[in-house]
Each structure stands twice: as C-alpha cells, then as structure tokens.
Amino acid sequence: MHTVIPHTHDTPAAAPVRSGAVAVVVGTGRSGTAAARLLHHLGASVRIVEKDESRVSAEFASLAARLGFDCRYGSHSAEQFAGADILVPSPGVPVASLLPYLDASRPPEIMAEIDLAARCVTSPVLAVTGTSGKTTTVSLCAAMLRAAGKRVFLGGNIGTPLSEYVLDVAAGEAPADVLVLEVSSFQLQTCTTLRPEVAVLINISANHLDYHADMQEYLDAKFRLFALQGPDDLAVLQSGMEELADRYALAARREFFDAVRRFPRTALLGSHNMANIEAAWLACRAFGVTQSQAAQAVEEFAPLEHRLEKVDEVAGVLFVNDSKSTTVDSMKAALESFDRPVLLLCGGKWKGGDLVSLIPVVRRHAKAVGLFGASREIFEHAWADVVPMSWDHDLQTAFRRMTAMAQPGDVVLMSPATSSYDLYSNYKERGGDFKRNVAAWKAERDD
C-alpha cells in the first residue's frame, strides 16, 4: 500500500532573509535575475557581481536601475563581496572560485537560487536529480500529475526558476498543488533548506568533473537532495543504489525502480526511458495519481527535443538527435536503444567518463564513428581498434562523411557524450545544427 504524501508546508519559513541584509548575486542570467528580484521583494539590499559586463542584457540593466541594484562588474575582487550577508552564485559558478574573495572572519550564507525560493513556498515539492534523464523525468511527472487534475509548477533547473513562481504567487497567482523541480548538482551543492516531500535520484555516473573536484564531491552534492527528508517523506532511487542509500543514511521511506515496461504505449525510446517512466510513476502515485492516469500521460507524452529525438527518416535512414547526451552513460543508453546499425556522431568538450567501458556496446551497435570538434584523442585512444573512426573539425563535415556511408536500415545518431562548448553556445544550438544538416541532406535527395 503506497502512502499519499501529506501537504506539509502549511506556512513558509518566517523571514527567509533579514530585511536590509546585503545579498550578493553572482551572474545575470535567468536564475540570477530571478534570485535578485526575489531578494529585493524580501527586503534585501541587492548587489550584482558579473565578471563579463558584455553578458549583461539591456533588459537586466533596466531592471537593475529600476530596482536600485548595486552592480559591480569586472574581475572578481574582495571589494565586490565586502559586507555580504548572503551569497547566491548562479548555477555553474563554482563556489570554490569565489572563496578567496570572501571575508573569512564574516563569511556570508551561501545559498542556491532554488534554495532561497524554497524557503518561501507552501506547496509540496517533488524534486528530481540525476546525471541524465532529469528533464524527461520531471516532464513525465508533471504530465502524470496534470492527468490527475492537479495544478503543477514545473521548473528549477528546467525553464522557469522557482523564484519566478514565488513572485508570481506573491502577485496573486494561484499556488500550485505540487511543485515539480529539476535540481542539478550545481544547485544542490549550496542547498541547505530544500526538503522535498518526494525526492528522486534517477541515475548517477561521472559528470561535471570539470566543475566538481572529484566524483565523491559530485555524489555528495546529489545526495544532498535527501538530507532533510524525514520518515514521512519518500526517496525514489534506481535499483542498485541500496548501499548508497544506507551510506548516506536516508531517513525517508525508500522505493527502488528498474527499467520495467509497465506502460508499453509510449513514443519514448530505450530502456533508460522505461526507467524514467517508472521513477516518475513511483513519485507521482505518492500524490494520489492512479496507474490509469499515469498510463494516459505516458501515452500522450511526446519525446523532448534533443533527447533521442527522431528527426526524420529519409530513404530508409533514420536520423536521431540526442544532443542533450553529454555523458558516456547517456551515449550508452542511446546506442542500446536501436537494433539497427548505427553511424555515431560524437565529440565535443570532454566532461569525464569511461569510454573503454563502452567497447562491447560500440562493437555491437556502431557501424562507424564520426568524431567532430574537441576530444578527438580521448575517443581515438579508447576505440581506435574497435570501430572504423574518422574526425572532422565541424559537425557538417562529419555528418556528410557518415551519410555517405549510410544504407537503408541504418541510423545516423548524434549522441556526443560531451558538452557543446567547443563549437556551440549550448546543446540546443548543436542539436539545431544537426537538424539543419538533416534537412539539407533530405532536400538534396528530393532535387
């Protein structure tokens, strides 16, 4: 018999920040902007720190002037952080890089934007973290909860910062029945008050080792999601994490999931997505979602862009955009999703991982590998004797090389296992480039 999670946040924590406290926000992206607006709303004195003034949009500059933010641009210095009571680094800004500039005799309270906002909410929280599949899983959770008639806020590391939701509710918008939050290791590292009624860890493997000091620090950050849970809360974890759950002394009730095909009517590909669906179901039934409601949501759920996205099938060749694949494990899951020969496009800014462990999977599924961008030597060192490989400076040339080899029944799969920052601004831009190449190749064949 599963437990329906009670509504535990009757009132938000009193005085989330002290009125007049000096709050320093590092970064002016969407998360930093939302944190600054919320801090101002709560009565803090807001200071903005940004190393690169060219990143500051005209819209933010206008907001800062209107609300009276103290903006300090340029290379970090002790002066920028002097007198700070609160420090909110934007996701992706390593806290360690800021420590040399802080007053050790009077250190500020360091908190993530999502942690700040969590102090202000009354609705129960369903939070999801993991190395890969977070966005698909939280989107599935939102779909299942909505199928059950619940009002849902979906945000955090995906799309809308939680601070924007808090401000909208303060302005009169109806609160959500459930807050569904995607939470990254960057955010969790500075979370001290976030307590989800349901916390989900879908998987964990080497990632962001260009940010975290080592795998242990990354693991510690992920398990902070469960740190404040109590026995009335629910922790949902992948099977095989039982020992980790014991090591981190999880206090919540635990449920473990496998990649079972409980909901067979779905457009999602791969066993990893079956695991994502099962994790979402275990999380959502705690809020009263029935299996039939979940099944309806899964059947209607469209695969998300850049995540094993079927772009087109031309002359019997299937083109799949998995640009969001930035880890070795996500590439493995992508390759195992097909029983057809795969022409694999990969490469980019290396984030860590064990490519040698993929040799059996590459042998079984990959017909050829087309590398592009950075990390050439890392891939070649691991796979040079395993599969035919080529390397090109850019995706377009590598794409042309793979399509020249493609035959009916093949799959041209871009699953890079790396970040995109060597050639692109983000994974979405990389995925868009792949899709443009597919469209151009199709148009040439139609001529």
Swiss-Prot record:
Disulfide bonds: none annotated. Gene3D superfamilies: Mur ligase, C-terminal domain, Mur-like, catalytic domain, NAD(P)-binding Rossmann-like Domain. It is found in: Cytoplasm. It comes from the Bacteria. The keyword Transcription regulation does not apply. GO terms for molecular function: ATP binding; UDP-N-acetylmuramoylalanine-D-glutamate ligase activity. Pathway: Cell wall biogenesis; peptidoglycan biosynthesis. One of its GO terms (biological process) is cell wall organization. It catalyses: UDP-N-acetyl-alpha-D-muramoyl-L-alanine + D-glutamate + ATP = UDP-N-acetyl-alpha-D-muramoyl-L-alanyl-D-glutamate + ADP + phosphate + H(+). ATP binds at G130, T131, S132, G133, K134, T135, T136. Cell wall formation. Catalyzes the addition of glutamate to the nucleotide precursor UDP-N-acetylmuramoyl-L-alanine (UMA). Belongs to the MurCDEF family. This is UDP-N-acetylmuramoylalanine--D-glutamate ligase. It comes from Oleidesulfovibrio alaskensis (strain ATCC BAA-1058 / DSM 17464 / G20) (Desulfovibrio alaskensis).
